[in-house]
Amino acid sequence: MVGLEHYLTVSAALLVIGIFGIFLNRKNVIVILMSIELMLLAVNINLVAFSSFLGDLTGQVFTLFVLTVAAAEAAIGLAILVTFFRNRGTIDVEDVNVMKG
């Protein structure tokens, strides 16, 4: 049977991959957004694993809310990215600081 340690190991691996994705690739906004989603997925796996281990459904319900917010965050981030690409022709992180209102 898969124990709590296995879920925590997978979650820690996803968190480390997400952190490395942000620090190693500082130019592409899409990779940064995907790395943030990986880190949120790691948190969700932790919530579900501990919720199942303790026999409480609160963590699983909270995970549904986090997934909903993460989906909205990804949609808004990609919409801003598409608009920025249409206006500037690039998606480099260094060029984002020219977005002044």
Curated annotation (Swiss-Prot):
Biological processes, Gene Ontology terms: ATP synthesis coupled electron transport
Please give the family membership noted in the entry: Belongs to the complex I subunit 4L family.
Out of the domains of life, which is the source? Bacteria
Keywords, comma-separated and alphabetical: Cell inner membrane, Cell membrane, Membrane, NAD, Quinone, Translocase, Transmembrane, Transmembrane helix, Transport, Ubiquinone
Its function, per the record, reads: NDH-1 shuttles electrons from NADH, via FMN and iron-sulfur (Fe-S) centers, to quinones in the respiratory chain. The immediate electron acceptor for the enzyme in this species is believed to be ubiquinone. Couples the redox reaction to proton translocation (for every two electrons transferred, four hydrogen ions are translocated across the cytoplasmic membrane), and thus conserves the redox energy in a proton gradient.
Residue spans crossing the bilayer: 4-24, 30-50, 65-85
Query: What GO molecular function terms would the record report?
Result: NADH:ubiquinone reductase (non-electrogenic) activity; quinone binding
Q: Which HAMAP family match?
A: NDH1_NuoK
Subcellular location per UniProt equals:
Cell inner membrane
Q: Which reaction does it catalyse?
A: a quinone + NADH + 5 H(+)(in) = a quinol + NAD(+) + 4 H(+)(out)
Q: Does the keyword Translocase apply?
A: yes
Organism encoding this protein: Cereibacter sphaeroides (strain ATCC 17023 / DSM 158 / JCM 6121 / CCUG 31486 / LMG 2827 / NBRC 12203 / NCIMB 8253 / ATH 2.4.1.) (Rhodobacter sphaeroides)
Q: How does it assemble?
A: NDH-1 is composed of 14 different subunits. Subunits NuoA, H, J, K, L, M, N constitute the membrane sector of the complex.
- Membrane topology per record: Multi-pass membrane protein
Task: Please report the name of this protein according to its UniProt entry.
Answer: NADH-quinone oxidoreductase subunit K
- Name the InterPro entries on file: NADH_UbQ_OxRdtase_chain4L/K, NUOK/Mnh_C1-like
Pfam families, per this entry?
A: Oxidored_q2
User: Under the cellular component aspect of Gene Ontology, which terms does the record hold?
Assistant: NADH dehydrogenase complex; plasma membrane
- Could you say which EC number(s) this protein's record lists? 7.1.1.-
